[in-house]
Amino acid sequence: MTEASARTIGPLPSRFSRDPKTPRSTDNAAAALLLAFTVLAILWANSPWAQSYSIFWDTDVAVSFGEYRAELSVKHLVNDGLMAFFFFIVGLEVKSEFVIGELTDRSRAAVPVVAAIAGLIVPAVIFLTFNPSGPDAQAWGVVISTDTAFLVGALAVIKPKFPARLRIFLLTLAVVDDVGALGAIALFYTDDLKLAPLAVAALLIAALAMVRRLPSLRGPAYAVLGFALWIALYLAHVHPTLAGVAVAVLIPVFTPERRQVEQTVDLVRAFRQSPNPQYARAVTRGLRESISINERLQTAVGPYVSFVVLPIFALANAGVHLDEQTITAAMSSTLTWGIVAGLVVGKFVGITAATALMSATGWGQLAPGLSLRRVAGGAALSGIGFTISLFIVDVAIEDPARQDEARVGVLIASVLAFTLSWALFRITDWISPPEPVGLTLVRPVDPERDHIRGDPDAPLVLVEYGDYECPFCGRATGAIDEVRTHFGDDLLYVWRHFPLERAHPRSFDAARASEGAAAQGKFFEMGRELFAHQDDLEWSDMYRYAVAIGLDIEQFDQDVRVHASKVLHRVRDDAQDAEVMDLNSTPTFFVNGKRHKGPWDAASLIRALEAGR
């Protein structure tokens, strides 16, 4: 077995793919189920049993407690009750993105954030040009939202070439989009506030913020207080689904700490040697608490939202009566065409124009491997505004006939948005086919950002994607020294992180430590220490290496542990580039921007660089 083949492993762990949002077959299945229930609702509402559709969803459900009594129709129970779980999941994703996800890098996040804001404003403006006044003008909120579930499924169906970065961009955009839509519901679609229940809701939110301090039973506490908050908001006449967002935002999220994971592994070994209830409880608790409750809830609740809540919501809300009268009325309705224009044209123009502006002015930058034409295809797909659009139809429009016209507009817009996106991806891929993944360096060398050795203006550039726990990368350091000696000032050497945790569980933490050293100008000095002690890469060891190379240990601790988001994102950013290029082994070299294939001993690298002169 060759060294290269010995180091080849499977794809990156999901940590580098925005965690729960990595491409999964369940995403496609959830979107297909949502579509199936949408079609079922339309067929039911237009079948000989159409009357039963209205009767069932309009049936009142009464809940009484002593002298208190509340009545909700089945449809409102779905929209106000079950949909709180949908907004809960959205809120968890929002919190995760801002704390440990794409939105931690403000320059990278700026483009999708501004594009999302434009994608909220431009559709609303276009809608209001069709409906400037009257009751229909209140429905402007219908056109501001993108359906994340359908977006993910539709992107999988269209299958644009190399969609990894586009998918991250669109999901980041969708998070901000959801925040805007939820804010619109809170500010513009809530009236007749009751102050006493609202005060109780504020106290409950304060209590929720303190739950994280409990030593145990935090999950049940979140559930009980969250349900109480839902009731308080309902009584305050604030849309109770916002309780889901409030609870989610107050739930902590963090990346797993290697030390805690290793402690749990030790407990597992102890349990294996001496099985007993005490060890069993300790192992269970250690495993549970090594992952943030935010991520655990996304995993636990998310499938129920995708496969139960959203299909039921679609069944309850998509039942548009498409008789000749409804279709005729919709085809001549400014409400219908305002929704179509807002979603299809507004989303496309707003997102694409804002992205172009941010890139042109330098106020933000697109992620590596992502171009404006790819964003344009994704912007068109963002016109699928199904879930929250139908949700706001029911909130903003009182007349059932006008509601049907609005739903027809949402359905037409979704079909047109999908068709436009498919056409854009097919045409742009045909006119300017993307290069095969991995043959060309996806992100050019940036001396201000990258870790470099040599003259930034050198004619020869050697980029290495490596792993500090990889023994072959450790051996390659000697080869790199020979290559640098051979070429002198004619060579610029660049190191980028590619920690393969599946094979090397301490490699990610080692990369973090090197970034902590980089903050004090000693990146390569720390790298030498890490390669020299590859069998000793616990945090206690790396703190010792930090002292050995003369780092300010307090500052190092702040950078890698207390304020770790910058360090985490830097390592993740390099690893995501490697994922985009479909790299699967270390070390991987790029010679003058082109992937080096073959041996990476000093003589082979020198020959490859000489050929590139």
UniProtKB/Swiss-Prot annotation:
Q: Pfam families, per this entry?
A: Na_H_antiport_1 (PF06965), Thioredoxin_4 (PF13462)
Cystine crosslinks:
none
Keyword list, A-Z: Antiport, Cell membrane, Ion transport, Membrane, Sodium, Sodium transport, Transmembrane, Transmembrane helix, Transport
Please give the Gene Ontology molecular function terms for this protein.
oxidoreductase activity; sodium:proton antiporter activity
According to its record, what are the GO cellular component terms?
A: plasma membrane
Q: Which spans are transmembrane here?
A: 29-49, 81-101, 110-130, 138-158, 168-188, 191-211, 231-251, 300-320, 337-357, 377-397, 408-428
Q: Which InterPro entries match?
A: Na/H_antiporter_dom_sf, NhaA, Thioredoxin-like_fold, Thioredoxin-like_sf, Thioredoxin_domain
Principal subcellular localization: membrane
Positions of the UniProt region annotated as Na(+)/H(+) antiporter NhaA: 1-408
Q: Where in the cell is it found?
A: Cell membrane
Q: Which GO terms describe its biological process?
A: regulation of pH
Catalysed reactions, as listed in the record:
Na(+)(in) + 2 H(+)(out) = Na(+)(out) + 2 H(+)(in)
- Signal peptide location: none
**Record domain Thioredoxin: where:** 409-613
Its topology with respect to the membrane? Multi-pass membrane protein
The family assignment reads: In the N-terminal section; belongs to the NhaA Na(+)/H(+) (TC 2.A.33) antiporter family.
Q: Which PANTHER family match?
A: NA(+)_H(+) ANTIPORTER NHAA, SODIUM ION/PROTON ANTIPORTER NHAA-RELATED
Return the protein name.
Na(+)/H(+) antiporter NhaA 1
